[in-house]
């Protein structure tokens, strides 16, 4: 039996839960979980905020561990390898998107949390393609959040060819934003951080922010003018998007990685007049996760993490709910 922590019903604390391991399919890998990050998406799964949860719900999709079993057709991994597993645990591996390496666009993706029991467990299984080797130079104990939060803010770098000539603005400096600062600064970009917290300035400067602007000070934001080549929003709250859009240069882009539930109201004239673009993206493909991890190893990018024992999982979750974690929570067995 595999020990796990599960929500037995929505919006309740997690309890010890045991389930039987299923036989590995030919293309699957069995991972002994050593640590697992807690993401706000896990809270959404536990609370059934999206209406897709099935109970008992074993969440967790920022897994770091060791390969302890491989299916008969597995060729990408060996027993003992240190690996990570993120939001997706499987793909069809035969559609147009998978064949192009864009597995995250596959119409038959399997979710680590919703398609099976996730990483808040002693073991988890996944399609070998979704299991990512962890390179030397990446701190294993802190790496879990890179598999979701990290790739979420790294993917636009690849998709839009962000480089050192670009001025970048980052809206929201939390679990996603603090990683975004590090990534974009490591590229050589001029980075402006937008935050509603007055107590983070020294920290944001140490992470690489060149300028810090209050995200609630409309006059200061307006005074920036149209200066950003790329403006990325990591928040899930409603803001004055026209105000922020007007800080984007002609041909620039406002990109969303935070899941704002309210409709985004923007002026079409602001888009047309400057040929500005609005876009969004979630997580990323296995190839881009690998690229991101290598980038982290080279540039010493690492999440700021608070560590908790799995036995304290409810303490960690409640602290995350209260927005008191700086900046990511990671559970270890």
Predicted stretch roles:
Residues 22-36, 49-96, 130, 135-138:
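Glycine-rich beta-strand-centered segment in the early N-terminal region that forms part
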Residues 177-178:
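N-terminal Rossmann-fold NAD(P) dinucleotide-binding loop
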Residues 2, 286-333:
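C-terminal hydrophobic helical "lid"/dimerization subdomain
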